[in-house]
Amino acid sequence: MARDTQGTQGTQSQASNIWTQVESQPMEKIVWGRLYGKNIKIKSLGTSSKYRIIYTHSSFSVDLNNDEFTAGRGEANDLILTLNDLPEKILTRISKVHFIIKRANCELTNPVYIQDLSRNGTFVNNEKIGTNRMRILKNDDVISLSHPTYKAFVFKDLSPNESIGLPEEINKTYYVNRKLGSGAYGLVRLVYDTRTCQQFAMKIVKKNMLSGARPSTNFSDPDRVLNEAKIMKNLSHPCVVRMHDIVDKPDSVYMVLEFMRGGDLLNRIISNKLLSEDISKLYFYQMCHAVKYLHDRGITHRDLKPDNVLLETNDEETLLKVSDFGLSKFVQKDSVMRTLCGTPLYVAPEVLITGGREAYTKKVDIWSLGVVLFTCLSGTLPFSDEYGTPAAQQIKKGRFAYGHPSWKSVSQRAKLLINQMLIVDPERRPSIDDVLQSSWLRDAPMLQKAKRLMKLDGMEIEEENFLEPPTKRSRR
C-alpha cells in the first residue's frame, strides 16, 4: 500500500511539474493584422523583437500581434525607419514616431485605428489623417508617409470580414462590426465611420421580408422608399433617433442611425423589475416630447413600445430617444396589421377592431404611451393573454386593473393619466399636448432634469416647454 501511495504522489508531482512548465511557456500571441511593404523594405524592427519578419516575394511584411505598433525614426519604435528603408529626401520628413496602429486587447472584434503623430503627414488611401487624429484602418488600405504619393505600406486585416455582400457605398464609408440585434425585418450592426471613428447602428431591412407574400407596389417603388427615407433623415430632435445616412438598394434598405449605448427601455425595465415613479416620469416626459415633435409634423409612430425607446447611457437619469418611427411607412398596411395582430399588447383598440382596414388617427400613439407608462411603473402589462381572456379582447374593451402590489406606491395622478390615455374611444382620448399639460407632469425638479438632458444634444428647446404651469399645490 505504501508503494501505491508513493506512486500516486510521484505521478501527481510529475503532472504538477509538467503543468508548471506549460504555464511558464509564453502563449503565442494572436496575429490580428499584417503590414506589407509597398515602396519600402521592412528591415529595421525595434530591438524588443515583438514582431517577426516574414519574407513574401519582393517585399517584406510584419505581423501585428500587440495592442500597439509604432513606426518612425526613433529607436524605441517597433519599426525603425532608416536610410536602408527610405530615400533620404523622404526620411528627413519622417517623425521620431510617425504613426501608431492599435487594436484594443488584440481582439479581432475591435476596429483597428491608425493615429497620425507626424509633422508632415500620414495618409490613408491618399487622404491625410491630421496630426494627433485617428481613423479606422480597413483591409487593403494603403498608408503613405509625408506625401500621398509615397505609398509605403498596405494593411491586411486578419479578422473575419463582416462586410461581405454589403453595398459599395457602405463598405467605402463604414467599418462594419458586430451584430447588435436582429428582428423579423432584418438585423442591426455596429458600424464606424472610418474617417471620424464615430459609432452608428446600421439597420439592414430586407424589402422582401416587409412586403409579405404578395408583391408590394408601395414598398418596391424606389422613389417612395427614398422619399420616406428623406423625411426620416430630416427629423432632428433630442428625443428622436437621428438618421445619419441611407442607402437604398433593390433588395434592402440600409439605415445608418445614432448608436445608443444604454440599450432599450424594455431591457432597462426587465433588469430593474420596474422603474421608480420619478424615473418613469422623466422617461415618459421625454417620450411625449418626441411624439409631439412627430405629430406636429404629421407623422404617427404607430409602433411605440419599450423595445423602440433607446437610452443614451447606462445612467439612471439619461437622455431617451424614440426609434423606428419611420419603419411603418415602409411597410404595406396589411403586412403591418398581420404583425401587430400577432403581438397586440401595445396596439390601440381601433386598430384591432378595424383590422387596420380603416384610417386611424394620431391617438393610436397616445394609447401606446399609456401602455408603456403602465409597464414602466409596474413592470407588468395592462393587457395579456395570461389574464384569462385573450389580450385582444381586453384591449378592445379597455379592461385592465392596477392589481400588482407596486401600484400601492404610485400616485393617483399617474393612474389618472393612464386611465385617460387608455380610453377605448379615440375621440375622448387626450392629445399629446393634453398629456404634456397633465398635472402629473407638473414637476419642477423633473422638468429641470429633462431640460438639462434634452439640451445635451446641442439643440435649443423652447423655454416655455419646461416651465411649470401655475397650479394649486399638488396632492398625491
Curated annotation (Swiss-Prot):
Effect of gene knockout: Does not affect male germline stem cells maintenance. In the germline, RNAi-mediated knockdown of Rtel1 in lok mutant background results in partial rescue of single Rtel1 knockdown phenotype which includes loss of germline stem cell and reduced levels of Stat92E expression.
Domain Protein kinase span(s) in chain numbering: 174-441
Family annotation (SUPFAM superfamilies): Protein kinase-like (PK-like), SMAD/FHA domain
Gene Ontology biological-process annotations: apoptotic process; cellular response to gamma radiation; cellular response to X-ray; DNA damage checkpoint signaling; DNA damage response; ectopic germ cell programmed cell death; germ cell development; intrinsic apoptotic signaling pathway by p53 class mediator
Enzyme class label: transferase
Record-annotated FHA domain positions: 69-129
The keyword Glycosyltransferase is assigned to this record: no
GO MF entries: ATP binding; protein kinase activity; protein serine kinase activity; protein serine/threonine kinase activity; tau-protein kinase activity
Primary site of residence: nucleus
Its job: May have a role in germline establishment.
Family (UniProt): Belongs to the protein kinase superfamily. CAMK Ser/Thr protein kinase family. CDS1 subfamily.
Protein name, entry field: Ovarian-specific serine/threonine-protein kinase Lok
Lineage, highest ranks first: Eukaryota, Metazoa, Ecdysozoa, Arthropoda, Hexapoda
